[in-house]
Regions:
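Acidic beta-to-alpha connecting loop that harbors the catalytic carboxylate
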Residues: 95-98, 123-125
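Short beta-strand/loop motif that positions the catalytic acidic residue
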Residues: 85, 91-93, 97
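Amphipathic alpha-helical segment in the mid-to-C-terminal domain
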Residues: 63, 102, 129-133
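Conserved alpha/beta-hydrolase catalytic His-Asp/Glu region
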Residues: 11-15, 29-84
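Flexible "cap/lid" loop of the alpha/beta hydrolase fold
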Residues: 1-29
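Short alpha-helix in the alpha/beta-hydrolase fold that links the catalytic acid
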Residues: 71, 87, 102-111
Length: 145
């Protein structure tokens, strides 16, 4: 199962490296605002408890670990890796995801994989497993049944 899927972008490796390094410099200067980034991650249906949980989690994020994940995503070429998958695959995407647009990520991945099913969740942002955990759990159970 994939959620908030990013399949990389069309930028060159050099452009992606510059983007990563710009984030590193921003974090080193203390300007990344981890706790304030919930606005970019959550959709309109997120509850007050979800907002609080995400803000708390973001503030506790280890910048070094976060940047390792950013570097991995920037270097990964998801379509070539994913095309080897032959099992049924569930892709869950929030319709209000402002981090990874469905049109340039989840929809392209689903189209490239014959055994993939894409589910778009209304009112949901980049974190469907957090924002709509019960719905996502139901989707997983149905997918595995």
């Amino acid at each position: 199962m994939f959620t908030g899927t990013s399949i990389s972008d069309d930028s060159s490796p050099e452009e992606r490296a510059r983007s990563v390094e710009a984030r590193v410099r921003m974090i080193e200067r203390g300007g990344y605002g981890f706790g304030d980034r919930a606005t970019a991650l959550l959709g309109s249906s997120a509850s007050a408890d979800t907002w609080a949980l995400v803000q708390q989690t973001l503030r506790a994020t280890n910048p070094t670990g976060f940047m390792q994940a950013v570097r991995f995503i920037a270097e990964a070429e998801m379509p070539p890796l994913a095309t080897g998958l032959t099992m049924p695959l569930l892709i869950v995407q929030g319709e209000e995801d402002r981090v990874t647009s469905a049109a340039t990520n989840a929809e392209l991945l689903a189209a490239a994989l014959p055994h993939a099913r894409l589910v778009m969740l209304a009112g949901c942002g980049h974190l469907p497993e957090v924002e709509l955990s019960s719905s996502v759990n139901d989707l997983i159970v149905a997918h595995l049944s």
